[in-house]
């Protein structure tokens, strides 16, 4: 469902590859050698070792943890859930990172981990391979079961990492961190959720229509809509190229039904995907309606991605689309400028991206429950959004006395789906950074006195703290 849905790993939240180690805060270093951290972790029942990747300043382990398929009935069997451990020191705070998708097995650091100069545990979401039960009972893929995975891993690791813990994630990972907090509110000392959509009522999506009527400037909106329409006017010519590309590259369309249906989805993604990953300043790259078909084809592929709705492009994200069609909900929006050019009403929905042998039925109420909890009962929650990110059109809402409960929500002006605390205006950036430090229990005296003194405890590392968003095709958060 549009490249945008993709955003829900897309973000996944700007994690990169570890380079040189950062300076430690205080005397703590990665040298926890007595006993060896790997040995300590592997003594935990259910843990198994996959690999270790050496790098300066940390220990980095890829591990599996045995989890119940059904936390309500553990006797029904288990599966191996993959996670990674970026170990700095046991006397530092720990950040529990989730992308909501597959886990990146290269060393990486989320923004809160850099802020607190701590350890990071990154967990793969259940049913994303290889963390999928065999055979897969898809009815056991829901937000409570996934939150229970996190809770159980946290309980296993807490005796080793006994300082404060924070949960974080971007997009679907931000949703995941929020759901974890809703079901297990006392596990974490704080939560930082980036660009996390909140689809409270699945059939009420007028917020997206309002968003696309006002995002950016009028000239850019008009040009994007015109090019999107032109892509359908030239459908037959471009689909012919698309089919040849698919044949040459071994791509198939069994799930969506045909190359023509896949192409309609790709085009419907176009405007959403542009704003998800680009800025107002990128509007100059949008071609005119008189552009050559070669240029138009290239633009569509760069923004939406022709592989997105092939069987091969969809397969990895089947668990996401299953959840979108059974519990999370998925955005819809009107496209009056495409009137008369769309051939497949209703095709732009999660059910059409999941193999038909997997049953799906939408269950109302889950998102409303989380929304109510955030507004009424949550504590120490920080939501960070980008003003120009379509996924921010339906954000989590804060209730009464939010600041007294240390709940905050900030929007970065002009920000997209890669927005971070560092992108906020100065006073909000300082406030957010100070709160994260306090929640982690590592706020220096100067920060306790004045939020304006707050800054990350670890220096920026260009490989470890990569700024760019990991992009994915299709409408995913």
Per-region residue spans from a language model:
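Catalytic-loop region of hydrolases
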Residues: 2-7, 25-119, 425-430, 434-477
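Alpha/beta-hydrolase fold active-site neighborhood
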Residues: 239-365
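A catalytic-pocket lid/entrance helix-loop region that shapes and gates access to the active site
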Residues: 187-249
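Alpha/beta-hydrolase fold nucleophile elbow
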Residues: 161-171
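Conserved acidic catalytic loop of the alpha/beta-hydrolase fold
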Residues: 148-163
């Amino acid at each position: 469902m549009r490249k945008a849905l993709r955003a829900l790993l897309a973000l996944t939240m700007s994690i990169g590859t570890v380079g040189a180690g950062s300076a430690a805060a205080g005397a703590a270093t990665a040298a926890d050698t007595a006993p060896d951290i790997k040995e300590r972790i592997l003594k935990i029942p259910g843990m198994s070792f996959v690999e270790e990747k050496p790098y300066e300043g940390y220990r980095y382990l890829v591990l599996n943890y045995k989890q119940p398929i059904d936390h309500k009935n553990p006797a029904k069997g288990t599966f191996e859930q993959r996670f990674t451990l970026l170990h700095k020191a046991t006397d530092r705070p720990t950040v529990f990172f989730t992308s909501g998708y597959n886990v990146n097995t290269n060393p990486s650091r989320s923004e809160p981990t850099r802020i607190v100069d701590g350890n990071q545990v990154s967990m793969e979401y259940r049913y994303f391979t290889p963390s999928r039960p065999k055979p897969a009972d898809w009815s056991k893929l829901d937000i409570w079961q996934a939150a229970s995975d996190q809770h159980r891993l946290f309980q296993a690791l807490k005796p080793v990492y006994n300082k404060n813990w924070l949960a974080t994630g971007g997009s679907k990972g931000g949703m995941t961190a929020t759901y974890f907090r809703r079901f297990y509110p006392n596990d974490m000392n704080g939560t930082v959720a980036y660009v996390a959509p909140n689809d409270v009522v699945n059939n009420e999506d007028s917020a997206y229509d309002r968003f696309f009527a006002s995002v950016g400037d009028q000239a850019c909106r008009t040009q994007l809509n015109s090019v999107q329409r032109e892509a359908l006017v030239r459908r037959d010519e471009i689909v012919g190229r698309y089919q040849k590309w698919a044949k040459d590259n071994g791509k198939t369309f069994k799930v969506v039904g045909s190359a023509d249906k896949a192409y309609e989805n790709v085009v419907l993604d176009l405007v959403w995907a542009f704003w998800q990953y680009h800025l107002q300043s990128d509007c100059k790259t949008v071609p005119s309606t008189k552009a050559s078909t070669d240029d138009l084809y290239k633009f569509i592929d760069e923004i939406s991605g022709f592989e997105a709705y092939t069987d091969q492009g969809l397969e990895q994200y089947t668990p996401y689309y299953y959840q979108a069609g059974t519990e999370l909900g998925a955005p819809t929006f009107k496209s009056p400028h495409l009137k008369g050019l769309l051939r497949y009403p209703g095709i732009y929905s999660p059910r059409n991206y999941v193999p038909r042998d997997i049953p799906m039925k939408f269950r109302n109420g889950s998102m409303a429950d989380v929304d109510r909890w955030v507004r009424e009962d949550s504590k120490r929650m920080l939501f960070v959004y980008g003003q120009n990110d379509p996924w921010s059109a339906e954000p989590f809402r804060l209730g009464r006395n939010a600041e007294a409960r240390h709940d905050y929500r900030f929007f970065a002006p002009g920000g997209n789906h890669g927005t971070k605390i560092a992108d906020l205006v100065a006073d909000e950036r300082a406030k957010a950074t100070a709160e994260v430090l306090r929640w982690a229990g590592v706020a220096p005296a100067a920060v306790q006195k004045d939020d304006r003194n707050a800054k990350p405890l670890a220096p920026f590392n260009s490989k470890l703290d990569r700024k760019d968003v990991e992009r994915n095709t299709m409408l995913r958060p």
